[in-house]
Amino acid sequence: DSEASKKRIKELEEGIKKIANDIYTILDNIPIYIYSTQETIFPHQQEVIEEILKHASDILPIFFKKISPYSNADLKFGYYNQFVNISGTKFISGYRKGSASHPNEEGTPIKEIKPDEEHDKPGTIFIDFSSREYYKTIKQDNIDEYIENEADIYDIYYINNDKTITIARGNNELRKEYQQNKHKIGSFVYHTFIHELGHSLGLFHIWEYILNEKHKVLDSIKYSVMSYKCPDIKDADFGGLYPMTFMLVDILLLQYLYGENMTTRLENNTYGFNSNTGRAAYSLNNIEDKLVSCIWDSGGIDTLDFSLYTVNQVINLNEGCFSDIGGLRSNISIAYKTIIENAIGGKGDDTLIGNPFDNNLIGGDGNDLFYGGAGNDLFYGGSGNDVIYGELGNDVLYGDDGDDMLIDYYGANMLDGGKGNDRICVASMDRGLPGRNIIQGGEGDDEIYLGTGTHNVTGGQGNDTFNFFCYEGIESNSSIWDFEKNKDKITLITRDYRKIDISKMKKVDKLSGDK
């Protein structure tokens, strides 16, 4: 939010052409553009690129069209082998997993690069398929001697902190793997394609935007695919997976540069299990599947469905916030300006957090915790001993099975404990919050706490206790429709939970039952 940050983003904005239609090509046997060991993307890997480009089109008003590899394109994709023979001499290089540039970028080619004279410089995305195994460790002072007498053109080096150099010798195993198997979503290579596409669309590495200490937390793949860092375990746990989409900060930056695609998934969509998004990064088929994704959605009444998982989860529907899903932590986020209305928890002890809009929050099995926030919300606890805070708005709270606690101090609400010995509280400690509630205790021995306002109460089956908070000078008007003598009881208490001795009261107009 500093002026320097704004200036940095402005420089990016000026360096990128805003385009409605972008074209790309998979490099074929055309004159070599970057690496002398360049190869075309294998056909089954082209499907991976197409899926990633569809995701980019989902968040940005850009349409990508595939064209002939013999034509100029705004984006070009290819593989390269980092182990190269430069001008017939031995060359030992440092390690890079991928390389990318955006269409307007200028720069001096590095030693390995051979420019293609017959094509305009496009945005390029090259992924390294060289693989290596440990060969030996030498002192840094001996590198020239090693290159002269022993080096192989397939060697690569890593500089260590102790003034030594680790030499790895290349093999062809990774190329064979890429040729035989499709890049899996959530793999490092899949993430690398997204990272390099980010560069081609104009993004720097995330740390280049960070100008003060408090923002350094953003330098991790929790927030951005443009980071090289995995998050600290206290901040997130992806279970060894990598981002499957552009992440929270990436989407914010890209939409600042290009604008937002406000036509993406305007219908009612489900993310997770039973997904109808048509995107692998948002779809789960069984409990073994995991996601590391940021959700962008333009409209409709949408749902996060994580109902089949048996682990404890945190589902947060607020934009810019993270959820802990499927045994991972902070692995699902919701992009800014995205509204997701509904959430379905799983079989564990889940926490469901609503947003300012009208939410349907379904807990499922387990002892679940609900926070509604603003909006007129519907809560369904499911089996287990649940705690539901309705908060602002006119809400409907249903505990279902289990010994539940239903709490809602604001608005005109409907609260139903369902089965079990439930506690229902609509009495705030603040005397200035009169309620207008319809309350059903349901089966079981329930405790119902009532305060100021108008309440229509049905205790239901069981031995129920109706606790009335009394405030000096404040009237309340509550009706109990099924009070049973010798079974139910009424208790009058002060705001600090001290029981009032009704025998010392000056006047009692009417009191039903024995107590």
Where is each model-derived feature located?
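Parallel beta-helix/beta-solenoid
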Residues: 188, 221, 290, 298-299, ...
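Acidic glycine/aspartate-rich repeat arrays in secreted/surface proteins
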Residues: 71-78, 204-217, 222, 240-243, ...
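Glycine-centered beta-turn/loop sites at beta-strand termini
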Residues: 288, 297, 306-308, 345, ...
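Surface-exposed or flexible loop/turn and strand-edge residues in extracellular/cell-surface modules
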Residues: 72, 122, 301, 312, ...
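Extracytoplasmic/periplasmic beta-strand context in beta-sandwich domains
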Residues: 73-75, 123-125, 224, 293, ...
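Zinc-dependent metalloendopeptidases
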Residues: 1-347, 365
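Surface-exposed loop/turn motifs in large extracellular/passenger domains
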Residues: 331-334, 431-438
